[in-house]
Regions:
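Residues in the short coil linking paired helices within alpha-helical repeat scaffolds
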Residues: 4, 65-68
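Short glycine/serine- and small hydrophobic-enriched flexible loop segments
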Residues: 1, 51-61, 119-126, 184-188, ...
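Active-site-adjacent structural elements in enzyme catalytic domains
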Residues: 10-17, 57-58, 70-78
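Generic hydrophobic/packing signal
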Residues: 19, 31, 50, 56-63, ...
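Second-shell loop/turn segments in exported
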Residues: 1, 39-43, 57, 61-64, ...
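N-terminal carbohydrate-binding/catalytic regions of secreted carbohydrate-active enzymes
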Residues: 1-49, 252, 256-259
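Extended ligand-binding clefts on enzyme/binding-domain cores
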Residues: 46-47, 67-246, 251-261
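Amphipathic alpha-helical interaction segments
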Residues: 6, 19-22, 63, 86, ...
Length: 269
């Protein structure tokens, strides 16, 4: 929130007028300023929906803004109705309304483990009470503990749960840019599982304590992630696991690319 209601309202105005265009109360995921119309894919992305609802709830509570709280509750209802599903005895968060379940995906349901924004789920339960939220939290965490692909024992960005969990067809079988944020979401939610943190940190780390995207089949690094916004994720995990202080090099914020900049800000918050 940055304690800046005026800037938050500008972001919310853009979100409301440019992204909340679907009939189900969820946000379109792809907006391109270089083309007209700007929306190039009308499907939603459930991590984005969770983050929007979560931000609105925090802002509404912090600034006593009933409109934000009502919008947050409305979005939480839509998430629960359209994105939280039951399959194979689990409660799951599908990545989007279209394209991740049978009959369109015969190997569905498909999940993206990094879409579980664990810190947001209890807030959703306050907005729209349902025992399904707790089950979503618990089953997501149990899945993360069980998803150990390849020699580095890492989760895949995209996972098929039609039978035994496996990397989903049609996607790179990798611990990729999506999954890099998983340890950060876990730490921000206050989840205490040092064994899980250690496995993720060891699996995603290459030379010089640098995180990387990983080819799951071979265990070999694909892209080394030198930006401070990526490196800080490993540093946060080290702080949680062994009490190591964050290095000064990652405590200085100098934004570069959008995604690692957001990871760094969330790590420093």
């Amino acid at each position: 929130l940055a304690n800046n209601p005026a800037d938050f309202e500008q972001i919310w105005y853009f979100t409301r007028t440019e992204l909340l265009l679907r009939d189900d109360g969820l946000a379109v995921w792809k907006w391109d300023p270089a083309v007209t119309p700007h929306v190039t894919d009308t499907n939603n992305a459930s991590d984005g929906d969770l983050l929007i609802a979560y931000a609105l709830a925090l802002a509404g509570s912090a600034w006593n803004n009933k409109d934000y709280l009502q919008a947050a509750a409305s979005m939480a209802r839509s998430i629960l109705a359209h994105l939280v599903i039951s399959s194979g005895g689990r409660t799951l968060l599908i990545p989007g309304v279209e394209g991740y379940r049978p009959p369109g995906r015969k190997d569905g349901p498909i999940i993206n483990p990094s879409y579980w924004v664990f810190e947001a789920i209890p807030v959703m339960a306050l907005l729209v009470p349902s025992d399904r939220w707790q089950k979503l939290h618990d089953d997501g965490l149990a899945l993360l503990r069980s998803l150990q692909f390849g020699p580095r024992k890492l989760p895949a960005d995209w996972v098929s749960l039609t039978a035994k969990p496996e990397p989903a067809g049609g996607f790179e079988a990798e611990f990729g840019y999506n999954s890099v944020r998983i340890p950060l979401y876990l730490t921000r939610a206050g989840i205490d599982d040092k064994a899980l943190f250690s496995r993720l940190q060891q699996g995603m780390t290459v030379e010089d304590d640098e995180p990387a995207t990983i080819d799951l089949a071979t265990g070999k690094p694909k892209d080394r992630l030198a930006d401070p916004g990526y490196r800080i994720v490993n540093d946060v995990v080290a702080c949680v696991v062994s009490g190591t202080k964050l290095p000064a090099s990652v405590r200085q914020f100098a934004p570069s690319l959008y995604y690692p900049a957001t990871l760094q800000l969330l790590s420093l918050a």
